[in-house]
Amino acid sequence: MTDTSDGPAPDRHTAFRRLHHGDRPLLLPNAWDHASAAALVRRGFPAIGTTSLGVAAAAGLPDATGATRDGTIALARGIARLPALVTVDIEGGFGERPEEVAAVAAELDRAGVVGVNIEDGRPDGTLAPLARQCAVIEAVKDRVPGLFVNARTDTHWLAAIGGGTPPSLATTAERIEAYVRAGADGIFVPALVDEHNIGALAGDLDETPLNILFTPGRHTYERLAELGVRRISCGSLLFRAALDHAVELAWSIAHPGVPARADQAADLPGYAEARSLADDFTGAGPT
């Protein structure tokens, strides 16, 4: 059943879609709290996303486990009041059944959010069954047709964070094609860094925007644009950079004679390191 309650005005939904089809790719910075969101909007970014890792780690909770459902929704309500278009990372959807995920999406839509990011990676390091994930996308689009659903496949991401070998591009393409048929408005393939593969997927998708996670040292905005990428996400990069800068600044005050690191970007804490910060609050960290 289509949700007819108050939400973003149709022109906001349309405006967000248009950002994916402009002359240049949409650069989407990802906030983790009210202050980071407001700072990005003040800088002039027309659209912002949230980072599930940043939201989770800032709350002392593990990422990608559904633990931040309430916090994510509360944050979304707050930052949706800013003069920018907001899309929210809802991990796997914060629900087991498709209708539960659709209810979360409808709640966010009522709050003024214009898009959601839904991933198929599961906490146990496996991919959700393809049919189940398609049912989730279909349920969300049926409930809130105007909401931009960015369907994320973790075929490459799970391999990257687990130290494994990514599957063939055909495996990723199979999921992508199914998600588009289910109604996805955009496709996100984090940890896909090979330029040939990026260009191939972008070409195959045609009018469906391909979203790539920006990887410092591997990507440039201009090159991704040349490859046909329509949306470039920062993911947890800004959160990790903020953590690193804060720690290094504090250290430099106490140790004024110690030179700064030569390559700040290369030495940023990685996803696993940032995610492990939550262990210090759950009893799984150092003793």
Where are these regions (language model features)?
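Extended, intrinsically disordered, low-complexity segments
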Residues: T2-A9, L237-T287
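Alpha/beta enzyme core
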Residues: D3, G7-V88, G93-C234, A241-V247
